[in-house]
A protein has these predicted regions:
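Bimodal "functional hotspot" detector
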Residues: 2-444
Length: 444
């Protein structure tokens, strides 16, 4: 037994078999033992952290393999190896290697011991919510062995599936409505595409269909999101509707339900009929307020401004996209807020328990430019390759970016590149500018 504990050679080959996250190779520094005499400590050397996609398609499984070489204290155990899970710069949980299913092999050569670890850092054992984490691996107690810490990215995704807008087709005798319904937390309005038989009187048909509420399979708030609207008509890009006089029930009782009712009306009319203003009357007469005190003395504007399309998991395990309004005064602020939302699942410093991050922090926005209504966004990684066999998640990421970026003023089309190379994935070929999908979140 040596009297002193050495700074050791730590070769961490961290192989993440998280097939939906084949991240780029990262690096960390660690001290190296040099020469035949283990008492001779060399200067800090650079060692590679290898992150491999492997063959597993589970978004909740991460196999971490690493080797610790050095002179160990006889009391050393798996409890000394720690994992910090960091989100948004804060450590949300610290766990020990012994908290996970692991395998450990030991060997010794010339007085230097080696411990080979294989640890399953699975989401269930970690008891963490879906999202992007930075993983820190280290030994805190230097009396056991001195170990240089290492960092890498980890992305836990929900088990639910995403239905791509590309699955929606225009069919003879049918039409598609985009309808807005609150999620079960009343934090987001979720656009849902419903395919219905074609009819001539579209305006009344649209409002009645919205009032039917979402299908229970979508896992959203059930029932009608809006009060009964006895009269509605359209002239050009202006819609006028009349609410009944008197108590509107739940729509007059609380601010959340009332605000979501107003938003559901304006967004549904805008997305389906191109309505820019909505004039609200009471009993076909002008009034000052309605819906729990909302001002109706002037028409409501339907222009949305910049929005980040968040990824939500509903009560029934559906993964859906939902817009969150951003408070930004220029393109740079809006785009920065969008990518913060993509990486944290948080918009405007508000985090819904249904929302989750879908981009790891290692994916950087390298550059963007806007020209002739086209925005070109250059990323540090091909986002369609982050999720392995989970192509539904790749579609979700692409659709989130397309829907978000086209909410910017004077932006109609998008080009996505990875290190300057246009991204190509299934039906998406960004060698040419692409519009956002015509529909979103098919109702199934």
């Amino acid at each position: 037994m040596f009297k002193a504990i050495f700074n050791i050679l730590l070769i961490l080959a961290i192989c993440f078999t998280v097939s939906m996250i084949p991240l780029n190779t990262a690096f960390f520094n660690s001290p190296a033992i040099n020469g035949d005499n283990p008492a001779e400590i060399s200067t800090t050397s650079e060692y590679e952290v290898v992150i491999d996609s492997g063959g597993d398609s589970s978004s909740n499984y991460a196999q971490v393999e690493f080797t610790i070489n050095g002179v160990f204290n006889k009391d050393f155990s798996d409890d000394f190896v720690l994992f910090d899970f960091i989100m948004n710069g804060e450590t949300v949980k610290t766990l020990k290697a012994s908290d996970f299913v692991l395998e450990r092999d030991s060997s010794s050569t010339d007085g230097i011991s080696s411990l080979d670890y294989s640890v399953n850092i699975d989401k269930e054992s970690a008891r963490l919510s879906s999202g992007a984490y930075s993983l820190r691996i280290y030994v805190a107690d230097e009396s056991a062995i001195s170990m240089e810490e290492a960092f890498t990215d980890l992305l836990y995704m929900p088990n639910g599936t995403f239905e791509s807008a590309s699955s929606i087709e225009n069919q003879s005798g049918l039409m598609n409505f985009i309808l807005y319904y609150p999620d079960n937390q009343y934090m987001y309005l979720v656009p849902v595409t419903r395919t219905v038989p074609r009819q001539e009187s579209v305006v009344r048909y649209l409002i009645n269909t919205l009032s039917d509420g979402p299908k229970s399979s979508m896992g959203l708030t059930g029932g009608s999101p809006i009060p009964f609207i006895p009269y509605i008509w359209v002239s050009g890009n202006v819609s006028t509707l009349s609410l009944p006089a008197g108590d509107l029930g739940v729509y007059d009782d609380g601010s959340s339900v009332s605000l979501f009712a107003a938003e559901a009306i304006t967004r549904t009319l805008r997305d389906n009929l191109g309505i820019e203003e909505v004039q609200v009357l009471i009993n076909q007469q002008p009034a000052e307020t309605a819906l729990h005190g909302i001002d109706i003395s002037t028409p409501w504007k339907t222009t949305g401004g910049p929005m980040a399309y968040m990824c939500l998991e509903t009560e029934t395990g559906k993964l859906v996209l939902a817009p969150a309004k951003l408070v930004a005064t220029n393109y740079e602020e809006a785009i920065e807020q969008m990518f913060t939302a993509f990486k944290t699942g948080t918009a405007n410093e508000v985090k819904s328990p249904n929302a989750f991050a879908f981009l790891p922090s290692s994916v950087e926005l390298l550059d963007y430019k806007i020209s002739e209504s086209v925005i070109t966004v250059d990323l540090s990684a091909d986002i369609t390759k982050l999720y392995g066999e989970r192509t539904d998640l790749a579609n979700m990421a692409v659709e989130a970016l397309l829907n978000s970026l086209t909410t910017l003023m004077n932006v109609d089309k998008v080009v996505l590149t990875a290190n300057g190379i246009p991204i190509q994935f299934e039906g998406y070929d960004f060698s040419e500018p692409m519009e956002k999908p015509a529909f979103i979140n098919p109702e199934r």
